[in-house]
Amino acid sequence: MKPTTPTPMKNIRNFSIIAHIDHGKSTLADCLIAECNAISNREMTSQVMDTMDIEKERGITIKAQSVRLNYTLKGEDYVLNLIDTPGHVDFSYEVSRSLCSCEGALLVVDATQGVEAQTIANTYIALDNHLEILPVINKIDLPNANVLEVKQDIEDTIGIDCSSVNEVSAKAKIGIKDLLEKIITTIPAPSGDASAPLKALIYDSWFDNYLGALALVRIMDGNINTEQEILVMGTGKKHGVLGLYYPNPLKKIPTKSLECGEIGIVSLGLKSVTDIAVGDTLTDAKNPTSKPIEGFMPAKPFVFAGIYPIETDRFEDLREALLKLQLNDCALNFEPESSVALGFGFRVGFLGLLHMEVIKERLEREFSLNLIATAPTVVYEVHLTDNSIKYVQNPSELPPENHIACIKEPFVRATIITPSEFLGNLMQLLNNKRGIQEKMEYLNQSRVMLTYSLPSNEIVMDFYDKLKSCTKGYASFDYEPIENREANLVKLDVRVAGDIVDALSIIIDKNKAYEKGRALVEAMKELIPHQLFEVAIQASVGNKIIARETIKSVGKNVTAKCYGGDITRKRKLLEKQKEGKKRMKAIGKVELPQDVFLAILKID
């Protein structure tokens, strides 16, 4: 494709699509791409913006993607830069990042489901960024679509005027041309000073096998060309421009310059994305801007888990694989750790459980690793008796009980929208998870919005699955971190044959310790193979044993070769066996099979 000529700023529109998961966001993006002929019919596939196999299989967007579209309206040529964003709560940092570079957003709502929790959260991010919001009701061709009710829902819940809302069906390609016209007439053109020194915001970066680290930028002021020397303001380092490109899901389109207001890809020939961090500012090395762009928040890990290779000699392979994934995922961080039970591995920080699942699946699939993950935990604020504070993300790091003054755990504010028929089940689940009700609001006769504060620890295990199961999959959920609060927490250890299995230790609410301990030891009794000696499985809090099960020893018939004759001979052999078992019990170690850990992590 030939390099394209610069477009005047008044003819540029930068917009993103925000929606709850499954509301047809990626399908709508495909429609807009097809209508603008950005990709030929031969190359067009469904979910073309979702480039990872795992995205296509799960039907979700994980990585925000951008595409440059050309569209002609009333004889005038326009450039539309579309940024597709993820819909799942774990990837909301991708949403906030993408919205920094836009002037408008399409708020896509399913005509059969109405406004969901994640829709509200993403809309507030867009409003905070002063974006023009264009409501779009999708799936209007479905027999159970209720457009009037959904319009009212958007007005009541979010407060956006829906008198001239766009009604579309991405699948049936209804209303797409009208939507493109509305994007051009409603979303404002970018503002910026084309004559000022270059100021470009890096809002995404990734690693390319041929070009090295690439930065996706929005030109706020000035322009950039291939002859320039660029200063990365965060690192203070200068680099020459190797190439400039317009984004496209299938192939990058080369250009000689990126003008003010445009979105494009910059190649500086760097080896690592850490040299062009997301949120950093690029400027002209010879004529730099006075200060960088501010206010961009980097992503912080929310959930931590140990990840270990099942084949212990593949520790270095796991390190290499994590480093490669980190090149494209600035929210992923890790550090080495070791476990007596599992050997050497890494403590990895994730944005949430789906992020953890996706990373683990990519490590196993793309790097052929067999992995085991420990129970996910959050970061606890531990106040010690000497007035110091320690932050603990691994239960094995928790100091002894007599050194602890108090423990504070992180809380989140959860917003849940549910059909009212499931309200009783849902409130029971939230109470079991130590939730505190803050607000309950009926959106209409059949839907309720609940606001609860919940301990983060309670939502990182199985909350999402239980929420879906108690509401038959109809509830939607979103959360934001709020603060650390004091809690009555203890460390629950599991001992096998007297030894603590460190990989199974968890930090838990004191009132739930007995119930969890009992469930763990009962499950382990079924899972651990019988030994030649008796094995005690115990759950303990501090030095106090709160639950115990015993695996009986396997009997070996030592008198099998004695035929008749003197009973004292048999007795002597049985006594000798008893002595041997006593000695084995004292020094014997129980090897726990890997499937024991896998099964135990699934225990409620």
UniProtKB/Swiss-Prot annotation:
Give residue ranges for domain tr-type G.
10-191
Keyword entries, A-Z: Cell inner membrane, Cell membrane, GTP-binding, Hydrolase, Membrane, Nucleotide-binding, Protein biosynthesis
Q: Give GO terms: molecular function aspect only.
A: GTP binding; GTPase activity; ribosome binding; translation elongation factor activity
Membrane topology qualifier: Peripheral membrane protein
User: In which domain of life is the source organism classified?
Assistant: Bacteria
Task: Identify the enzyme class.
Answer: hydrolase
Q: Which CDD domains match?
A: EF4_II, EF4_III, LepA, lepA_C
Q: Quick one: where is this thing mainly located?
A: membrane
List residues binding GTP. 22-27, 138-141
State any GO BP term from the record: positive regulation of translation
Question: What subcellular locations does the record give?
Answer: Cell inner membrane
Q: Which GO terms describe its cellular component?
A: plasma membrane
What this protein catalyses is: GTP + H2O = GDP + phosphate + H(+)
Q: What is its EC number?
A: 3.6.5.n1
Role noted for this protein: Required for accurate and efficient protein synthesis under certain stress conditions. May act as a fidelity factor of the translation reaction, by catalyzing a one-codon backward translocation of tRNAs on improperly translocated ribosomes. Back-translocation proceeds from a post-translocation (POST) complex to a pre-translocation (PRE) complex, thus giving elongation factor G a second chance to translocate the tRNAs correctly. Binds to ribosomes in a GTP-dependent manner.
Similarity annotation: Belongs to the TRAFAC class translation factor GTPase superfamily. Classic translation factor GTPase family. LepA subfamily.
Q: Which NCBIfam families match?
A: lepA (TIGR01393), small_GTP (TIGR00231)
What name does the UniProt record give this protein? Answer: Elongation factor 4
Q: Which organism is it from?
A: Helicobacter acinonychis (strain Sheeba)
